[in-house]
Amino acid sequence: MDWIISDGLVPYEDALATMEARVAAISEGRAPEMIWLLEHPPLYTAGTSADPADLTDPDRFPVHTARRGGQYTYHGPGQRVVYVMLDLGKRGRDVRQFVCRMEAWVIATLAEFNVTGERREGRVGVWVQRQDKPRTAAGQLQEDKIAAIGVRLRKWVSFHGLSINVEPDLDHFSGIVPCGITEHGVTSLVDLGLPVTMADVDVALRKCFEETFGPLPVEA
């Protein structure tokens, strides 16, 4: 498996072309699986379920059609984007399990920083409860999204992946309704008061990956 960390900001079109080529190579047995960690310049992406009404400021940043699952999301500096190109044909062919493992990977990574990430029924991604914010009118803790997940499969090879908010400009999310959810906000590790660097997150991601996914099964 190739584990790649790109410096600088990678244009979205370049990343998409690289993913497309790598997915084809993996499916044809010409290349190993790949995990690609990068940052994008500020942009919005629209998944296959995106509602145009959720793009509330269409002129703010470039908007790209992503052809992944999900709705609108934001990518930009300070956010760790992780493109996950795994051969699910050799890992069980279970899409639901794959998405659950993506969530579990993020949750384990956050736990390295003593942050409790949680799943929520009907809301893909990873959420944190905000003890530091006023409770809702119903007396419940507010919840903010810290990581988004959106994937696609081609010939049982995954691509696209996840993003974790490390230290992005959270105001940049205001041009969309993130993931179509209006009643919850977004947060980041730094917003939660943690002096975490991108390099710290990268180390935690790699440590937790094999614990969550395991190595590629060896064919007999």
From Swiss-Prot:
The active site is at residue 179. Its EC number is 2.3.1.181. The record marks 145 as: Lowers pKa of active site Cys. Substrate binds at residues 68-75, 148-150, 161-163. It is found in: Cytoplasm. InterPro entries: aa-tRNA-synth_II/BPL/LPL, BPL_LPL_catalytic, Octanoyltransferase, Octanoyltransferase_CS. Pathway: Protein modification; protein lipoylation via endogenous pathway; protein N(6)-(lipoyl)lysine from octanoyl-[acyl-carrier-protein]: step 1/2. Its main location: cytoplasm. SUPFAM superfamilies: Class II aaRS and biotin synthetases. Belongs to the LipB family. Catalyzes the transfer of endogenously produced octanoic acid from octanoyl-acyl-carrier-protein onto the lipoyl domains of lipoate-dependent enzymes. Lipoyl-ACP can also act as a substrate although octanoyl-ACP is likely to be the physiological substrate. This is Octanoyltransferase. It comes from Dinoroseobacter shibae (strain DSM 16493 / NCIMB 14021 / DFL 12).
